Amino acid sequence: MALRVAAFDLDGVLALPSIAGVLRHTEEALALPRDFLLGAFQMKFPEGPTEQLMKGKITFSQWVPLMDESCRKSSKACGASLPENFSISEIFSQAMAARSINRPMLQAAAALKKKGFTTCIVTNNWLDDSDKRDILAQMMCELSQHFDFLIESCQVGMIKPEPQIYKFVLDTLKAKPNEVVFLDDFGSNLKPARDMGMVTILVRDTASALRELEKVTGTQFPEAPLPVPCSPNDVSHGYVTVKPGIRLHFVEMGSGPAICLCHGFPESWFSWRYQIPALAQAGFRVLAIDMKGYGDSSSPPEIEEYAMELLCEEMVTFLNKLGIPQAVFIGHDWAGVLVWNMALFHPERVRAVASLNTPLMPPNPEVSPMEVIRSIPVFNYQLYFQEPGVAEAELEKNMSRTFKSFFRTSDDMGLLTVNKATEMGGILVGTPEDPKVSKITTEEEIEYYIQQFKKSGFRGPLNWYRNTERNWKWSCKALGRKILVPALMVTAEKDIVLRPEMSKNMENWIPFLKRGHIEDCGHWTQIEKPAEVNQILIKWLKTEIQNPSVTSKI
C-alpha cells in the first residue's frame, strides 16, 4: 500500500539544534558524566519528573525544582560537582532560545502536503508556564499552520516510545501502519513504529534524512525551496463594511505593527501567499486584502466606484473599522498606485509605504494621461480595456486560459499581446486555448483564481483602468508634495510593462527612498521570486519599523 501520511518529530527534526544536543554540550562544559542531564531528560527513570512533565501531569515550573533536586542528588552519588549557580531552568531557557525551525525539513513537509499527503507532528512536549514560554508558543504557532495534525504528549497523556501513542496517531489520522512514514532523531522512538509496520527514518542529519524521505515517498524536493505559502483554508478571513453595500474581504495572520498587502490586476489576496506567513513570523500583523472588485470583496459595476480618490478613502475607513491608526502599505501593480497615493493624500495613516514594480509617476497637468498611454506601445492593452464589456467577454470566456496566459515568467510572457491588443482585438489573441501552467503556479492555484473571479467577474477589476482622467485630475492636487514617510521601491529586472528605468527619478519626490532590485524577475514578483521579495521586505521593515532611526526626516 502506498504511503499517504508523513509524521515528523519536533525536536531534532523540525527544530534545531535539538535540546538533546544542547544538554550534551552542557554536560561537557560542566565536566559532568555522559548522560547525566540527557539521561534524565530522556525519561530513563519511569514515572520520574520528566515523564510526568511530558505526559502533562505537571507543568514546566513544577518540573524545574524536582529536576534541580534530582541533579544535585545524582551529582553527589556519582561524585560529580555542580556549580553553585546550576539551574535547569536556565539551561532549558538557553536551549529553547537557540532552537529555530529547520526550514528544509518544513519545506519537505509542505511539499508532501501539496502532493496530497496528510502531515502530522508527533512530539514529546510539555506545558510551558515559564517566563520564556513565548518562544515555544511562537514556534508551535508557525509550525501548526503547515501541518494537518499536531499531537503533543502533554496534551494526550502518552509519550514516545510507548506503543499507545503510535496507535493514537493511526486512529487520529485514520491510517494503516504501512501508509505512514515516521521521522525521529531517536532510534528508540522509531522502534515501536517500525514494529507496527510504519516506514521509519532516523534523522541524524537533515540532508541524509531528506534524501531518504524523497526515496520512500517518490517526491523530489526542490534544491532551492520556496518559502512555505499559506492556503485559503489555513488562514483567518474577515470582512469590513466600508460603506453601505460595500465590504472588503481580507486575510489576517500574525501580531505586531499592521501591514496591508494590496494586490494588482488580475489577482487576489492569494497573490501574497508566500509573503503572509513570512511577514507574520517576522513580527507583524498582516492583512492581505481582496481589493475592491475582486474575489470576496464587493464588486459594484459603476466605473466611478473605482476612482483612486474613493479607493483611498475606503482604505482609511478599513483602518478605522479595525481600530488601526497607522499601517504599512505594500502594493503591487495597480495597488502600487494606490499605496503611493495613500502616502500623498493620507500620510498620517501610513506608517511606511512600499511598492513592487510600480513607480511613483506624478502627473503632468499639461498633458492628458490618455495621450501618455497612447504614446507608450506597451500600455496599448490599457486602451483595449477602456470599453466596458469588451475585455470582460474575452477574459471571462475561458478563465483557465486567461490566468495561465497571464501568470507566466518573464521568459514566456509573450503569450499576451499587451502592445497590440487594440489592433488584434484582444489581449489573448493567438494564445493557446489550453496553455500549459507556468512554473510559477500550479493547477490548484490557477483553480483558486478561477473560483474567485467566478464570484466577482472582471468588470470591477477592469474598472480600475477606466478612471484615468478622473484620477489624473485628482492626483494633480498633490503636485509639489513629497513623500516623507519611510518608503521602499522594489524593481523587477524583466518586467516588460513596469520597467525598472521608469523609477529612476523617484528620489525627486521621495528624498529618503530605499530601493530593492530583483534580477531575472518579471511582473508577478511575489510569486516568481518570493524568497527574494521576503528578504527585501523583512530587512526594510526591521530597519524602518522595528528598529527605526531616531533622526528626523523633516
Curated annotation (Swiss-Prot):
Active-site residues from the entry = 333 (nucleophile), 465 (proton donor), 523 (proton acceptor)
Activity regulation? Inhibited by 1-(1-acetylpiperidin-4-yl)-3-(4-(trifl uoromethoxy)phenyl)urea (TPAU), 1-cyclohexyl-3-dodecylurea (CDU), 12-(3-adamantan-1-yl-ureido)-dodecanoic acid (AUDA), 1-((3S, 5S, 7S)-adamantan-1-yl)-3-(5-(2-(2-ethoxyethoxy) ethoxy)pentyl)urea (AEPU), N-adamantyl-N[']-cyclohexyl urea (ACU), 4-(((1S, 4S)-4-(3-((3S, 5S, 7S)-adamantan-1-yl) ureido)cyclohexyl)oxy)benzoic acid (c-AUCB), 4-(((1R, 4R)-4-(3-((3S, 5S, 7S)-adamantan-1-yl)ureido)cyclohexyl)oxy)benzoic acid (t-AUCB), 4-(((1R, 4R)-4-(3-(4(trifluoromethoxy)phenyl)ureido)cyclohexyl)oxy)benzoic acid (t-TAUCB) and to a lesser extent by 8-(3-((3S, 5S, 7S)-adamantan-1-yl)ureido) octanoic acid (AUOA).
Which organism is this protein's natural source?
Answer: Rattus norvegicus (Rat)
Q: AB hydrolase-1 domain spans which residues?
A: 257-530
Q: Where in the cell is it found?
A: Cytoplasm; Peroxisome
One term under GO cellular component:
peroxisome
Family of this protein: Belongs to the AB hydrolase superfamily. Epoxide hydrolase family.
For the modification N6-acetyllysine, the affected residues are 176, 191, 215
The consequence of residue 332 to Q is: Reduces epoxide hydrolase activity by 95%
Q: Which residues bind phosphate?
A: 123-124
Protein name, please?
Answer: Bifunctional epoxide hydrolase 2
What does changing residue 523 to D/N/Y do?
Loss of epoxide hydrolase activity
**Record: residues binding substrate:** 381
Residues with the N6-succinyllysine modification = 55, 176, 420, 454, 504, 553
Where is this chain primarily localised?
cytoplasm
Per UniProt, Mg(2+) binds at 9, 11, 185
The organism's taxonomy opens as:
Eukaryota, Metazoa, Chordata, Craniata, Vertebrata
| Enzyme class at the top of the EC tree | hydrolase
Residues with the modification Phosphoserine, per the entry, are 368
Subunit structure and binding partners: Homodimer.
